[in-house]
């Protein structure tokens, strides 16, 4: 039975609080509204899980990926397609048209709060999903109004690092087959080699710079082919490094939010193919996540849902990331 969201909240008079030296008027909730977060490193299946949950509960999705907020480069940024979204409304996905300016954590905080409020007003559950942990931290840790108004449940989709790296490599090859290079070629600006801001930071854009310049300069075919192969390998390498950094950040956040973070291990899904993979997904990821969300939505505010005891995997030191990639991982 789907929980009735109207019954989950009761608003009474605003409350004035002193927050960092300033008096802030905030709504006081006897029962807070509830927000679900789906976290995980790149490639682990966050979008799939968010959509699965949104088809089981009355929910809408708010994107928290700092590159997917921009319009364009749908292959490079691996946005969900209309077919994959299964009709579930998505917010902050491809909505920023100024692709040369950074969409900061403060920008996300402001727009995400608006999206969450609009979703809650329609008696639906906001599911915030994406890999930009600085966005989530800005919303949960740095915004007093958000903390006072909402209870949060965090789902962490995890995959064994060697298995994830193998999958990421395969995914990059598929993205190339789908037209990644042509997509980057269309936005390539030979007058600029600055990839420090906006959508140009996306992994897959700076790595192709040298190859695209070689095309324009009519280098020999064998040279351009070699540069393309090098660029693709660099895309794979940087994506794996990004995944490691994201995992490190999630482990740090887990220590802060341990009481209501639920880790689901999707490794088995990536070791299987076809129907077996779908079955493993349902059993290992979708079903336990749905149970956690159902309990979270059903319990009153004074019940703390304990996340499962998590034995955190050891993460070895990660080599320094290129500046643009490091910016994405924050």
UniProtKB/Swiss-Prot annotation:
Induction cue: Down-regulated by cytokinins and up-regulated by auxin. Not induced by nitrate.
Pfam family, one: IPPT
Catalytic activity: dimethylallyl diphosphate + ADP = N(6)-(dimethylallyl)adenosine 5'-diphosphate + diphosphate; dimethylallyl diphosphate + ATP = N(6)-(dimethylallyl)adenosine 5'-triphosphate + diphosphate
Record: transit peptide: 1-39
The keyword ATP-binding is annotated on this UniProt entry: yes
Stretches assigned to coiled coil: none
Biological process annotations from GO: cytokinin biosynthetic process; tRNA processing
Annotated compartments: Plastid, Chloroplast
Job description of the protein: Involved in cytokinin biosynthesis. Catalyzes the transfer of an isopentenyl group from dimethylallyl diphosphate (DMAPP) to ATP and ADP.
Matching PANTHER family: ADENYLATE ISOPENTENYLTRANSFERASE 5, CHLOROPLASTIC, TRNA DIMETHYLALLYLTRANSFERASE
Protein name as catalogued: Adenylate isopentenyltransferase 5, chloroplastic
Upper lineage: Eukaryota, Viridiplantae, Streptophyta, Embryophyta, Tracheophyta
Gene that produces this protein: IPT5
């Amino acid at each position: 039975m789907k929980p009735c969201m109207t019954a989950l909240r009761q608003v009474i008079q605003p409350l004035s609080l002193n927050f960092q030296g300033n008096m802030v008027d905030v709504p006081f909730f006897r029962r807070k509204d509830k927000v679900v977060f789906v976290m995980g490193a790149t490639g682990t299946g966050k979008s799939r899980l968010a959509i699965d949950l949104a088809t089981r509960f009355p929910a809408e999705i708010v994107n928290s990926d700092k590159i997917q907020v921009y319009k364009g480069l749908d292959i490079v940024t691996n946005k969900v397609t209309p077919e994959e979204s299964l009709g579930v409304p998505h917010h902050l996905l491809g909505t920023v048209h100024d692709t040369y300016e950074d969409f900061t954590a403060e920008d996300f905080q402001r727009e995400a709060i608006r999206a969450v409020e609009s979703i809650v007003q329609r008696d639906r559950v906001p599911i915030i999903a994406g890999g930009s942990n600085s966005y989530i931290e800005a919303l949960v840790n740095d915004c007093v109004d958000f903390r006072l108004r909402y209870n949060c449940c965090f789902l962490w989709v995890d995959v064994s690092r060697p298995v994830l790296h193998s999958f990421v490599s395969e995914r990059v090859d598929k993205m190339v087959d789908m037209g990644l290079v042509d997509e980057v070629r269309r936005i390539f600006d030979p007058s600029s080699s600055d990839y420090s801001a906006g959508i140009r930071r996306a992994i897959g854009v700076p790595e192709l710079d040298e190859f695209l310049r070689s095309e324009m300069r009519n280098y020999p075919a064998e040279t351009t082919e070699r540069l393309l192969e090098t660029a693709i390998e660099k895309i794979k390498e940087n994506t794996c490094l990004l995944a490691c950094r994201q995992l490190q950040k999630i482990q740090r956040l887990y220590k802060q939010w341990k009481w209501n973070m639920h880790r689901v291990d999707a490794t088995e899904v990536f070791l299987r193919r076809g129907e077996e993979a779908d079955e493993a997904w349902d059993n290992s990821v979708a079903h336990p996540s749905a149970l956690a969300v159902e309990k979270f939505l059903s319990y009153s505010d004074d019940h703390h849902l304990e996340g499962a005891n998590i034995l955190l995997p050891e993460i070895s030191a990660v080599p320094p990331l290129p500046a643009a990639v490091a910016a994405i991982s924050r």
